[in-house]
Each structure stands twice: as structure tokens, then as C-alpha cells.
């Protein structure tokens, strides 16, 4: 088990600063009691409990019911006659469906079970693989809470790694159709989720399985170097190229695959190319109009020479799904956070590009008046304040969130990132990241603790509350990131 570290690494300098603030403004001892360095001693333990509660859901109800991983076969419809239509393949699949415990087969057949080779079939599983891998690696997996032994959790994770990586196109070089996944707008994201877990557990994975992962990661990295043009919401002249659709979060989730590749293959001749493209992609993901042509240096390179457009508005907001969308502001922070997590685990300095403009985005979530984009919301903010201007922990946005009810785990991660990386340095003390962090933690705890007839233990959402197919495993992914940044690898 890895040594766990303090949940809120504020340091003596932070405490000294808070003491000065409290004294200068005549605050009482309550000010220090609520400071990040003096947060409730049980917060870290409660975070671990919440993560294990969600793993309880994912490795039991989700695994056995929603994903039917108890139904497994080593021959699936993707290996059937290529002349069959999708409908015919599904008919073959159903006719041969048998109940087999996952322990009794050498390899799970992920596409037999999910019937999808695209996002809905792969992404939720990739997040689960990521989360179980990190829980085992960082040592907070609690089999007493989850109800699945650590050995079984590891076996389940490894079988999923083998199954999903095994269906990547790189492991079927002679295939002439599109049965296998890869080289798509999200495939680098899925590959990094799977690859990170495999890399962390590499000493526990059979060489032939790890080789599948290596081929998958190398193939996706090759695509990003040689067959990928960085997209921009707005070009260098200010013309909107993709109306209503920033490309920032997509670039960020692809970039992290290159970060993984550089650590998995430190001696590769491609490492220089990976690092160069990684730098460009990270900066492009969060570039603002004023960054175009800028002489500002990031990791010793001029920003203006690395980008040819922007994906974030000048005030730190962004547009996605034709909305000024808080979910995607948070998602960019989360995806950039994945790259930071890799550097922290590898013990290397985090590049400046990985935090480029993240402070502007986080500040916008707290400080941008929504009346700028929706007159009916004048005087309101993405992070909601009460009538006295104090943080509440609730969130909103111009228009209605098209995904449904908010998932507070991602906002908690954003706050942890802002607190540990100093993204809130320009924000007034009453609305510092640690204040929101505490509030969003409580919202998240309330969310997972709710009881209802149709809600399984450890589930964040009630049926119908959120339409994102990966929402449960994605919430856990955010918490696993937060744990790395604040506890296991805070610096």
C-alpha cells in the first residue's frame, strides 16, 4: 500500500498567510478553523469511503446487471462472418448467449456484452479500468466496503484490460473492416484510461496482455503525431470555425495519451515528437483569442508559435453544445488534470503547458456574471452565491444543462486542482477554491448517500437524473484524480 498524505497540503506559508488575513480583518479563530490546513481531519477518510462506495456499485450492480459481465464468452459476434449485417450478428449473439461466470473464462468478450464498439460500449468500461487500477495502485481499495476482494477486483480489471485493448485495431493488423475500435475522436481518451491502469499494474499483468496495451498506445500516439490536425473553435483571424462547439476538451483528452506514451516508452525514438505535439495540444486546448501571436513563454516556447487559433473565450468561458457550458469548462480542467496526474505519478515536474489558462477557466466559473450571456441570470454565477454573496455549493449556467442533474464530483475535482495548483490566486478570499471544495464535497456526499427504491448503494444518480452513459464511472474517475493530486502525489 502506498503511503497516504495529507488531504489539504496547504503548507506553513498558507497558514501564515491566512493568519495575517484573519488578523488584518479582525476575523475570529473561526477563520483559521475553516482554513484548508485545518480542515476536518476525517475528510480524507470520507473521500476514500465515498470512492469505495461507488466502486461497490460499479463492481457489483453495474458489473452484474447493467453491463452483464457475468455473461461472458471467448467467441463473440465481432469474430463472426464479416458478411453478416449488424442485425444478423446480434441474432447470432443472442442464440449463443450462455451464463458463464467471469472467473471461468480466460477473456471477457467486451463487445459481445455491450453490443457497441463506440463510445457507449467502451468509454464507461475504460473509466472503470482507470479507477480500479488507481485504487489498487494507491492502496485505498477497501474490499470490506466494496464487497469484492482485492484479488477479484484486480482479476476483473485485468480481464477488462485484455478484452478492450484486445479489440483495438492495432491488435488486428490484418482486419479489413471496422469491427475494431481506434483512430476516432474519443479513442485516445479510452486508450489512455486503459493504458494508465495497465501501466500502474504492469507487474501484475501477463506479458501477452501488456503487449496488447503497448500496441494500442503506440498506435494512438502514431495517429496523433502523423494523422491529426489540431482543431480550433475560432481561427487566428477570429472567425468561428465550429459554431457552438469548442474543441478544447477533445484536444485535452487526446493529449493525455501522448503523456502516457512518453512514460510507458521512455527510450522511444518518438519521444521528442510526442513531447512537441503534447505541448502544442495542451496549449491549444485552452488557448484564448489574445494568445494568438503572443510572445508569452510556456516551457520556454512562444505561445504564438504553437497555436493557430483558440478554443476558450477571452473571459475564460467556452461554448459547447451551443451553450456556455459549465460541464465542459469543468471537463477541460479534468482532462488537463489527467496529464498532470501522469506527471505526478511519474515523479516528473508538471509542464507549464498542462496548466495553461486553467486559472482563467476556474476564475470564470466563480467570477463571470451570467447576465453577460443571459439577461435573466444577471447577478448570478456558474458557482452560485447566496443573497449575501457567499458560496453555496450549487451550480448553474445560461440555459439548461442538456446532460441533466449536476455531478458534484467533477466540481470537487476542479476545486482540488485550483487549491493544489494555485489556480485561484486572483480570486478573493471568501471565494477561494478551498471554500468551494468543502461545499462541493458535501454536495457529493449527499448525492451518493441518498436512498431510493430504484437506486443501488454507491450510485451517485437516480435513474433519469443524468443521461451521460459513463456518468457513474466518470464521477469515480474524477475522485481518483483528486486523490492523486491532493493525497498520494500532492507535489
Briefly describe each language-model feature range.
Residues 16-26:
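Bacterial N-terminal signal peptides
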Residues 25-38:
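Sec-dependent signal peptide cleavage junction
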Residues 380-397:
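Residue-centric detector for conserved, function-critical "anchor" positions
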